[in-house]
Structure formats: structure tokens, C-alpha cells
């Protein structure tokens, strides 16, 4: 590694000579700008605006433009002679708890290495700082600007974390912060269950840069002359509709992807016995199912017979069709599930009614009797297709 800064740590009357090294490096794939047709590199020249002449890098300085358009030129010597104690020193201001420093202030990390002559005071300060459980708040001048920073211990060495100034932290000004967004306790409970399901110890080595790997694979395929196969796109982003359903599905997916976690079908259960019902349970949750009619009425059924079936609302069963085959069907206001199953079986095997004018006439004359029968105890009513007299009612 190449040192990016040299100076001292100023700690009271103690000065520790140190060097800074960048603690991180980006692994992005590097590209050059080229001409599309032949891949020829695009080059830029430093040209003076006044005369168009190319300027050597050694002749370039920094300029500050005044409001009237005039420019003040500053050289490297001007920056080197700044009247700042932090230009070549890390000034320790105070020692603060790390948890009180909001991570939003952190900018860049540097390793701090001691010079040969400063190894002992370096180790002394390192061990004392580690035992205190605090971090040193310091000031340092880097790249022509003074910065706040923290000094902490990591892996036996000091790590300098540069920080932004408080007036450089932007404040969120979002409209929803002014709105009264209500969150129900049931929703909060399910969200907490999802967090519990995904809880883990921090281990960044488990994750990789999938985009960079895919990009490198495309480059390698281009070099080898292979065809680049486009990967299928991810799921399209959709607006959140049923929030509770989305949370439950997320819990089920998270548990299914973890060993030892039972997958929750449809997100019906949550960790720790937290309630998942949102108070608006559908018919299935309450044990209620939609029940259609046992069978469809014949096209030849009389209109008054249809009206009588509509009043029953599917809750009772009666003999349908005036010319049905003789038989009995139980009727009741509250039919158990076993009875309903039997009734449906009977309905499935019912013979079609005979299409005779006599049967239609019989059905018209006996509609009142059938309506009364549907509201009373179970009865059977054998029908004689050719008879015009009301059928004899017998007990089941």
C-alpha cells in the first residue's frame, strides 16, 4: 500500500508519528470511452480558454472565481502554508461513546501505521482506547480541507474514519412525514415477525457483487467470441396492494429459504405466536364456505317453483320438478355437513322430469303445498305425473 498522508497524532503533550493508508478500494470494472465503430480511444486535452494552447499538468493551478468574474490563482505552496495545526497533525479533541456517533457522518476509512520511533506510544494509546470503550474525536486536514474524524481500534491498529460536517448533512423533506399514516397493531406484529425471521449475525463475506460478476461474464464471453445470453429480468416492481398478504408471503418465503425453519403456507403462522389475523378474515378463516344450489332447475320448471327455491336460499332442500322420479329427500333449516353431502349425491342421481303438460299442471297446483313443506319438518311427497289432485303428504 502507498501512504496518502504523513504526520503525527497529537495526544496531549505526546506526538506519535504516523502514516495513513486507504483502508478500502473499489472493485468496479474499469472502462474507457471509445469510438463505437472501431473502438478507438477518446482522448482529452487540457486546453487554455484564452488562446487554445495545450497546457502541461505541471503548469495547472487552482483558481477561485470572484463574483465579478475575476479569478484568484492558488498554488500548492499556498495550500502548504495554511495556518492550521491539522495540516500535519491529527488533533485529538475528546473521547466519546461510539454509539452516539450517527453513521451518516462517516465518509472514508484509513489505516493508521506508526513510524518506527512511535511504536510504543502508539500501542499505549491503542490499548488504553480499546479498554475505555470509546473513540477519539479528532480533526485532520486532508486534500485541502479540514475534516472531523474518529479514531478507533480495529484488528490491532487505529482506523481513522473521516466525517462530514453537521451542515453538510441534508435533512429529509418528504411529504409523507407531514401525513398521519396509521399502522394497525396486527400489521406491526406481522412486520416484527418478518424481522425476527430474517435476523442474523453480520457476516459480509456471505454476499457478493452479482452485478459485477455478471458484467465480467459478459466481457469474458465477448473476448472468447461466444454469444452473450441475456438473463431473464427480475420481478417487476409493483405497488403494495394487500400489505398483510405481502408480509405473510415474505415470512413464508424467508422461512422456506432457511434450514430448520418450517415453511408457512400462505403465511398463516408467524414466529413467537404473534397474531396474523387483521380482523378482516375472509369466509375461509371463519369456517364459512360459499355454497351453491344442489342442482340446477330444469328448463321446464314452473315459475312459482323457482320463486319458492329462491326463498329457501340454498339453506333447505326440497323436491324439485313436479315429474321427478318417486323418492324422498330430507329437508331441514340447519343441515349438517354429512346431510348436505348426501343431499348433493341424491341430487346428482335425480332423473330428469317428464315433459308433459299434466306434470306442469300438477306443479302449478301444488306450489303452495311445496312452499309450506320446505319450512316444516322433513317430508316426502311422491308425485303422480298424470294426476291433477294434490299429492298425499306422508311422514318420512
Swiss-Prot record:
Pfam families found in the cross-reference section: Ku
Chain intervals with Basic and acidic residues compositional bias: 294-312
One GO molecular-function entry: double-stranded DNA binding
CDD domains: KU_like (cd00789)
Biased composition (Low complexity): 278-288, 337-396
Organism superkingdom: Bacteria
GO biological process, any: DNA recombination
InterPro entries per UniProt: Ku70/Ku80_beta-barrel_dom, Prok_Ku, SPOC-like_C_dom_sf
Keywords: DNA damage, DNA recombination, DNA repair, DNA-binding
Compositional bias segments (type: Polar residues): 315-336
SUPFAM superfamilies with a match to the protein in the record: SPOC domain-like
Domain Ku: 9-189
Similarity remark: Belongs to the prokaryotic Ku family.
Job of this protein: With LigD forms a non-homologous end joining (NHEJ) DNA repair enzyme, which repairs dsDNA breaks with reduced fidelity. Binds linear dsDNA with 5'- and 3'- overhangs but not closed circular dsDNA nor ssDNA. Recruits and stimulates the ligase activity of LigD.
Quaternary organization: Homodimer. Interacts with LigD.
Name of the molecule in the record: Non-homologous end joining protein Ku
Amino acid at each position: 500500500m502507498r501512504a496518502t498522508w504523513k504526520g503525527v497524532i497529537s495526544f496531549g503533550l505526546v506526538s506519535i508519528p504516523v502514516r495513513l493508508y486507504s483502508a478500502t478500494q473499489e472493485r468496479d470494472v474499469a472502462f474507457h470511452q471509445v469510438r463505437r465503430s472501431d473502438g478507438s480511444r477518446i482522448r482529452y486535452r487540457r486546453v487554455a480558454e484564452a488562446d487554445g494552447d495545450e497546457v502541461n499538468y505541471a503548469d495547472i493551478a487552482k483558481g477561485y472565481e470572484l463574483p465579478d468574474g475575476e479569478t484568484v490563482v492558488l498554488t500548492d505552496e499556498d495550500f502548504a502554508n495554511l495556518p492550521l495545526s491539522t495540516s500535519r497533525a491529527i488533533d485529538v479533541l475528546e473521547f466519546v461513546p461510539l454509539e452516539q456517533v450517527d453513521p451518516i457522518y462517516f465518509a472514508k476509512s484509513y489505516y493508521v501505521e506508526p513510524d518506527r520511533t512511535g511504536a510504543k506510544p502508539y500501542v499505549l494509546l491503542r490499548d488504553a482506547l480499546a479498554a475505555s470503550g470509546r473513540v477519539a474525536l479528532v480533526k485532520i486536514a486532508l486534500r485541502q480541507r479540514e475534516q472531523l474524524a474518529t479514531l478507533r481500534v480495529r484488528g490491532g491498529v487505529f482506523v481513522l474514519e473521516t466525517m462530514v460536517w453537521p451542515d453538510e448533512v441534508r435533512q429529509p423533506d418528504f411529504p409523507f412525514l407531514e401525513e398521519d399514516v396509521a399502522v394497525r397493531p396486527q400489521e406491526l406484529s406481522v412486520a416484527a415477525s418478518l424481522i425476527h425471521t430474517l435476523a442474523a449475525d453480520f457476516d459480509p463475506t456471505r454476499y457478493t457483487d452479482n452485478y459485477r460478476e455478471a458484467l465480467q461474464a459478459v466481457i469474458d464471453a465477448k473476448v472468447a467470441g461466444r454469444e452473450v445470453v441475456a438473463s431473464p429480468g427480475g420481478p417487476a416492481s409493483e405497488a403494495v396492494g394487500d400489505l398483510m398478504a405481502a408480509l405473510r408471503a415474505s415470512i413464508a418465503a424467508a422461512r422456506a429459504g432457511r434450514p430448520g425453519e418450517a415453511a408457512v403456507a400462505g403465511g398463516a403462522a408467524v414466529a413467537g405466536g404473534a397474531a396474523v389475523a387483521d380482523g378482516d378474515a375472509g369466509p375461509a378463516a371463519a369456517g364459512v364456505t360459499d355454497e351453491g344450489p344442489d342442482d340446477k332447475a330444469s328448463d321446464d320448471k314452473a315459475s312459482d317453483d323457482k320463486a319458492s327455491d329462491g326463498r329457501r336460499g340454498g339453506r333447505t332442500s326440497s323436491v324439485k320438478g313436479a315429474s321427478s322420479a318417486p323418492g324422498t329427500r330430507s329437508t331441514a333449516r340447519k343441515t349438517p355437513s354429512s346431510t348436505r353431502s348426501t343431499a348433493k349425491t341424491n341430487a346428482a342421481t335425480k332423473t330428469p322430469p317428464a315433459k308433459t303438460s299434466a306434470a306442469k299442471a300438477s306443479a302449478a297446483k301444488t306450489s303452495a303445498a311445496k312452499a309450506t313443506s320446505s319450512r316444516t319438518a322433513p317430508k316426502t311427497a311422491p308425485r303422480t305425473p298424470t294426476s291433477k289432485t294434490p299429492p298425499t303428504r306422508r311422514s318420512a
